[in-house]
Each structure stands twice: as C-alpha cells, then as structure tokens.
Amino acid sequence: MGQKIHPIGFRLGVSKDWTSKWYAEGTDYANYLEKDFEVREFLRKKLAHASVSKIQIERPRNGAQITIFTARPGIVIGKKGEDIEILKKEVGKILGVATSINIEEIRRPELDSYLVADNIAKQLERRVMFRRAMKRAVASTMRLGAVGVKVSISGRLNGAEIARTEWYREGRVPLHTLRADIDYGLAEAYTTYGVIGVKVWIFKGENLEGLEADTSNTNELSDEKRNRRKPRNANRRKE
C-alpha cells in the first residue's frame, strides 16, 4: 500500500535514514523522544523565517549534536555567529547536556519537499489561488531536474463550506518502488477559513546504491544451485 503509508518511514533502512540517531533503554527512550520533539518544535518556531527543512539529532555519550538543514544559513548563524551561540545555550537547557549545532546549506530549495510545501502554504495564507500556487511550485521543481512531482492540498479551499482535496502532478511518482528516491514534506497553512494541509512528493530518480552488489550475490547463489543439481539420468541404472 504505497499510497497509504508514509513515504519516508516506508523506505527507512533502504534509501532513507533516521533523523534521530541514538540508543536508549527503558524509560530513557520516552524521555529522549520527548526532548527531541521539544527541540524540533523550539527550533521550528525560533527559525521560522530561515527556511529550515530538516533537523537531525544525534546523541553521543554525555552530549548532543544537532544538524540543521536550511536554505538560509546566514539567518541561523547570525552576525559573527552570535545567534548560533544563543541557540546552543537554549537547546542545551532543553536537553540538559552540552550541545553542538552544525549547519548544512540546502543548495536547491526547489528540490526539497518540505520547503516546497511550506512555500505553497505561505502563499495560501497570502490569499493566492491554490491552483496557481501548485502549478508554480511544480513547474519550478521540474525545471531543476526532478523526475516527477505531486502536490496535494486539503481543506476549505477558497473558503468553500465543504472541505475537499485537490491535487496536481507532473512526471511520475512511483510510491510502491522502494529504490525510488522520493522526498516527502507536509506543511500547514493557517487561513481565516481554517487549516489547509499541503503535501508534496518529489521523485528524484532511482537509488541504485547497493543494488549491483545484491544482484551479484544472487547470481553467485544461482550458479551454486545450478552446479549442485544432478543430471536427470544420474540415478538411472545403466542398461
């Protein structure tokens, strides 16, 4: 059911990686998970205008390392690195351990699903027509080399009394294929009529890393099985 399941969770361990990397036992797991949620909520609000896409949290021994993926690193770092030092202290208070923050720049924000969804949501809040916002976003993403894009918008569109879902797609987006490199993002637009959800799927091509090794292993196994087979007439008595 590739259409129903979360595209990132479906591909974890295959072509996608976890955004929280740590190990915990017992009650520590719930505490770590809650702290991760608090940190992400805090950074999303604090860096609302910095085009932050993803926040990765790692917990080595007696510390924490946070990587912020953003299209506008200058806003996060601040003048002479002042803002990032303040962020370290505030995040360290939430986690209760020494924290380091790394910044990763997103070179092409048009190919990042969350940033595309967030851009559409902000346009909807400015009362831009939803079809125009969808088509503009899809066109700019396809122009930069995406194989396929799908955008879905749900809610009281144009202030309608009954909520509905509208979607627009260009290219192909194979949700069932595990090796397909599909980026998925969700954003919300808060309008006077209510909340409108924006979902974006971007297909960037097939991830073939490790595929050649797997096929070579299967070929070796098939050769071994073929050699083990006995000829049909081996068990027959010679007349």
From Swiss-Prot:
Biased composition (Basic residues): 227-239
One GO MF term: rRNA binding
Keyword Membrane listed: no
Organismal lineage: Bacteria, Pseudomonadati, Pseudomonadota, Gammaproteobacteria, Cardiobacteriales
The protein's assembly and partners: Part of the 30S ribosomal subunit. Forms a tight complex with proteins S10 and S14.
Entry function: Binds the lower part of the 30S subunit head. Binds mRNA in the 70S ribosome, positioning it for translation.
PROSITE patterns, per database record: KH_TYPE_2, RIBOSOMAL_S3
SMART domains named in the record: KH
GO cellular component: cytosolic small ribosomal subunit
GO terms classed as biological process: translation
Protein name: Small ribosomal subunit protein uS3
This protein's UniProt keywords: Ribonucleoprotein, Ribosomal protein, RNA-binding, rRNA-binding
Residue ranges of every copy of the KH type-2 domain listed in the record: 39-107
Entry-linked InterPro entries: KH_dom (IPR004087), KH_dom-like_a/b (IPR015946), KH_dom_type_2 (IPR004044), KH_sf_prok-type (IPR009019), Ribosomal_S3_C_sf (IPR036419), Ribosomal_uS3_bac-typ (IPR005704), Ribosomal_uS3_C (IPR001351), Ribosomal_uS3_CS (IPR018280)
Record region (Disordered): 215-239
Similarity annotation: Belongs to the universal ribosomal protein uS3 family.
Organism this protein belongs to: Dichelobacter nodosus (strain VCS1703A)
